Amino acid sequence: MKKTLKIIGILFLILMGLGSLTKAIVKPVAADSLEEQIRRANRDCPIPVANGVGQVSSISLEDGFIVYKLDYKPEYINIDVYRNNPEATRDMFYLAFLCVNGQGGHSDMMSNELIKRGLGLRIVASNGVSSFTSELSPTYIKEMQNRINVNPTKALHDALKLKFETENCTFPIKIDEGMILKGLGLEDNNIIVEVGIDENLYDVASFAAVSDEFADNIITEANNGDPELGALLDLCKISHTGLTYRLIGNYSKNHYDMNISSSLIRQNRNVPPQVNIH
């Protein structure tokens, strides 16, 4: 099942990029200009994730926008999904910005700085074959700041919901013999991975016997360098969520949940240093 989860995606990388710049702005060196703060953040680039599957390639100031350039290997991101859902994608980026902006007691410091200077955010994502651009104008940032008032964890959970709603159009996908990835979602404090099971090949109830071993194996494979699982567990850690594989029988519709608790993930994964979320 592990090999199917290509959800490294936009959200995690933009959290890392935003986190890098937020640190530079809220902890500036004396007499630093904003331009110098951006240059300092850019010196951390490229910021890789998941063994180089994706990266924040650069952070720069161009034409009144702070520009984040994100690059992925082609098979790890479906550019069309985001290009075809521009408003949801922009809102997801804003919620990620709100999450990072609210960390460490910094409140609205970064958004206020952007509004004061009349600057927006621009995200340019590429998979080496095609690309798309999403812009958060100063007007949009100010409107959203006036309309949305949530804590960082709630902002990130809302961003996750938007992410999954946007990307679920790519499912179902066959992931193994007798297994189909049906979709991703957020339920309570767990990321849910729905997997359809062919009951001619598997007894859904039999998975209960290997539940603990399954959780340990997922953690071990992630820590041994599996890019997809590593990114997925890191996303769970920074969003304070657990991970649930929901196995659903294709005939009976009975299901069994294979759970990896948030506490287990947090004990075994480190928060990426660019993301100031604990």
Spans of features found by a protein language model:
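Positively charged n-region of N-terminal signal peptides that target proteins for export
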Residues: M1-T4
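Hydrophobic membrane-insertion alpha-helices, especially the h-region
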Residues: I7-K23
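N-proximal, solvent-exposed amphipathic alpha-helical segments enriched in charged/polar residues
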Residues: A24-F65, K73-I77, R147-E187, N200
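Short glycine-rich, low-complexity/disordered patches
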Residues: P48-S60, C99-G128, I173-G185, N224-Y251
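Mature extracytoplasmic domains of secretory-pathway proteins
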Residues: S60-M110, K182-L235
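C-terminal partner/receptor-binding element of secreted or periplasmic proteins
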Residues: R117-K154, H240-H278
